[in-house]
């Protein structure tokens, strides 16, 4: 990833890495050669995914570009819920000499625990870290203190070079190594290393381009200088191989998929020509760049085949200027409405709360404007401090205060106090359960009217006061709570909502009958009897 040249006035803590890393020459006395590498060393590539359905594209790129070392390498993927000690056990089963970890904001805590344990149990193993979470401000991180090497930036090639040096006993003296920029034409593509199990059960991440020309300061892609495409014919050949093997779920990680319309059209036509009932494509699109010819093509895709992730973030021009975001707001709204009315694409639109200059009131306006565009989902994100992102240049000016622990979310600004930030966090969580889940697709539109933000905020406050929780609410109980909240907050709507919410409840396919729900606040839920501890004690007496 290209480095951003910052102004001297910008307060950014950067690491001081060595010059671009190049491999040391092989020692003349070394017995290493391409034929005996596999018997001389063992490499494990590992990462901790947020969910099982996520397959690591980054690890597969590293594996694809290991050349003669590939035969002695193994990929091991884990999920967040796995205990660190169990991950260490599974890694050690491979008897590795080198372990490379992909480190991201969602797995930094868990990976730190694994690396710490691994260094205690098997200190002789060389641990190499890479990924966005350790590519910046690395020297201040606990995980780096435990590791042997850190490769910053795109490590597709530099990981191979470092492994050769470690195996050959010519490893560099520096711990933090800056990867040489990668020419995409020099990369071996990784798609053949998706297994049949991956194709059957997991999301397949693919990329037709790398980088982003936009400079939105909350995003690490703002450090890129441009969006660089892979050779299109080669990329489509790889997609065809995946398709012929049975792949039907493709998630493009391109930051700006519709930047080059000619390329976008060819990729879309490629998949349209192979359309089946189970083919599903996921793209991140620029909201104000949908020319007529692309629109015409999009109308040809059947229901259930497309999902568009549309980054709006904010409609406030002042905030957009603060974060260097260029967006034609009227055109973005027009295109969102057009997509909803004229295509079968599932539209997932993003807003971010806590941006420099944003207030409760301006965020309310952005939410209401986006709601009127009628996307299927509105993802309400809370600003996070991604290491290396230019957003931190605003820290003093806007008194940005971030959580020191992952996920490094914003806690307050000069415009938004901590209590308000917590309020929006609850709003976002309830919106995800009620608005984005699709569980209330019939009734929610009737609960909210001309002022959806304030009405849903009232619902948020009522639900939290009633339950004191934003997680682990039983679905049947959630239907009851929403009905009771409407009775308390909007009594004139309650009779209508009861009749409509029955449609939502039926769609949920819960086993209990709708007539058994407590839809009125005055109804008392029957006691569940003994609490769990008493039940446990009672079993020992039987």
Question: For the regions a protein language model found, what residue spans apply to each?
Answer:
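Radical SAM enzyme core and accessory elements
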Residues: 1-48, 67-68, 84, 91, ...
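Acidic, low-complexity intrinsically disordered segments
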Residues: 2-245
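Conserved strand-to-helix beginnings and helix N-cap segments that scaffold or border functional pockets
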Residues: 56-59, 85, 111-112, 232, ...
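Alpha-helical structural signal in soluble globular domains
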Residues: 65-69, 117-121, 144-146, 165, ...
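Residue-level signal for the nucleotide or nucleotide-sugar donor/cofactor binding architecture
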Residues: 82, 154, 230, 259-262, ...
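Conserved C-terminal portion of the radical SAM core fold
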Residues: 98-100, 126-128, 236, 243-253, ...
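Radical SAM [4Fe-4S] cluster-binding motif and immediate context
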Residues: 188-341, 345
